[in-house]
Amino acid sequence: MRQKRKGDLSPAELMMLTIGDVIKQLVEAHEQGKDVDLNKMKTKTAAKYGLASQPRLVDIIAAVPPHYRKILIPKLKAKPVRTASGIAVVAVMCKPHRCPHISFTGNICIYCPGGPDSDFEYSTQSYTGYEPTSMRAIRARYDPFLQTRHRIEQLKQLGHSVDKVEFIVMGGTFMALPEEYRDYFIRSLHDALSGHTSNNIHEAIKYSERSFTKCVGITIETRPDYCMKRHLSDMLTYGCTRLEIGVQSVYEDVARDTNRGHTVKAACESFHLAKDSGFKVVTHMMPDLPNVGLERDIEQFIEFFENPAFRPDGLKLYPTLVIRGTGLYELWKSGRYRSYSPSDLIELVARILALVPPWTRVYRVQRDIPMPLVSSGVEHGNLRELAFARMKDLGIQCRDVRTREVGIQEIHHRVRPYQVELVRRDYVANGGWETFLSYEDPDQDILIGLLRLRKCSEETFRFELGGGVSIVRELHVYGSVVPVSSRDPTKFQHQGFGMLLMEEAERIAREEHGSGKMAVISGVGTRNYYRKIGYRLQGPYMVKMLK
């Protein structure tokens, strides 16, 4: 049979040849120890076969032969930063609902877009519906099961490991929704991982524990006034391990003028209660709010990181954006509000990042809202990178957890740790003694793993934590995702750092805190790890009596 010439081939056949050629070049480059620019390779190869468009990354990944997958998939992985911290994050959105404080303040926060009464009516509160997570949620009609399944499949196609998943529940104040809906939503997340259809939360969690894809944590976005004792107890039942609390400003006058509907004092109380329950606390903060100014903005972040009433474990920094349909938009239109200039904003963010202590992680530096929807505010999509460049000019450093993570360092700087040692930092926060233990390479300032230990204060309301108990609020070894039951000598997960951190934490709890019991707030999927080292389940915590 006569072989077809290139001119006789269909576009689909030419695309198959292009993909095969790209894979062949990648294999050759690997065997010769060369680094390649995948985008240039795809463009050049597509042109060679007369194609106007490049082959899609998912198609190249799908076509990699089985015996080359282990070698090539890490090189092909789209946005490797997504799983560089060792966990695949799956963001899901609850259904659109009104903000809870409308009933007593009469309106939403002045800068808040989205929600059922906004110009973006099919979006959730504080989102426009055009963010990537919002669009995925709308396509799934806000069904939590479908959102999870679709996102996990998408991450797999892009070459990411999804053996360990952390959920982020977004879309306004989740804890203000009816209990029946909340139970259904969380149950669906666990069922999407296990494949089992559960009748209640406890059944869903039981099956999720044994799932191949482990739920290592759930993060819930909330407000300080929906972070009280009953809310915290419900969230513990769900398997939640981290809270994202919207604070926005440490100034009471700013909270009042922006119609937040809660006080800063309430935020401090919620931090105390949350940490005494074992939660990791991440806060949302907004520089450039009305009636603040550059000087007050810098002062509030000094207060935020130095005052023991705040001192969060993580930060999402969201510079104020002016978006159509908000109260702030009307102030801006009438000339009563002006955003910082781009250079002032970069300078401010650089100064804020320099203040961040080494035990705090900066998760984000700007919102995901598409620029065409922004009337005034951030003008650059790469604000973090511009702030880092400014810091370099000023001779100052950002030493937050994310910047120093081993996985991030390897991706951005091709740097691996050489001399690893245990580092201990103690500080007081929210009425308790905190110890931040980490394995680091001090010379290169690279972080391999961390543990957050807290001596619970006497005000803790959970009976499991009363009477002299220390609690591990976080244990995390960084580096690319490695399945829970396997080892990879080139990765840092599952090499024993977690066990060493736990041993040191138990020693501190026993000898320095004088605690008779150690508790761990553990993701549902990691409970078996703690069972192997002598812990048992008590309520939502894994606990162990200390000799």
Swiss-Prot record:
It is an enzyme of class 2 (transferase). The gene is Elp3. GO terms for molecular function: 4 iron, 4 sulfur cluster binding; metal ion binding; phosphorylase kinase regulator activity; tRNA binding; tRNA uridine(34) acetyltransferase activity. It comes from Mus musculus. It holds the Pfam family ELP3_N. It catalyses: uridine(34) in tRNA + acetyl-CoA + S-adenosyl-L-methionine + H2O = 5-(carboxymethyl)uridine(34) in tRNA + 5'-deoxyadenosine + L-methionine + CoA + 2 H(+). Keywords: 4Fe-4S, Acyltransferase, Cytoplasm, Iron, Iron-sulfur, Metal-binding, Methylation, Neurogenesis, Nucleus, Phosphoprotein, RNA-binding, S-adenosyl-L-methionine, Transferase, tRNA processing, tRNA-binding. PANTHER family: ELONGATOR COMPLEX PROTEIN 3 (PTHR11135:SF0), HISTONE ACETYLTRANSFERASE-RELATED (PTHR11135). Component of the elongator complex which consists of ELP1, ELP2, ELP3, ELP4, ELP5 and ELP6. ELP1, ELP2 and ELP3 form the elongator core complex. Interacts with alpha-tubulin. Acetyl-CoA binds at residues 164, 474-477, 497-499, 530. Its cofactor is [4Fe-4S] cluster. Its EC number is 2.3.1.311. NCBIfam families: ELP3. It is found in: Cytoplasm; Nucleus. Tyrosine-phosphorylated. Also serine/threonine-phosphorylated. This is Elongator complex protein 3.
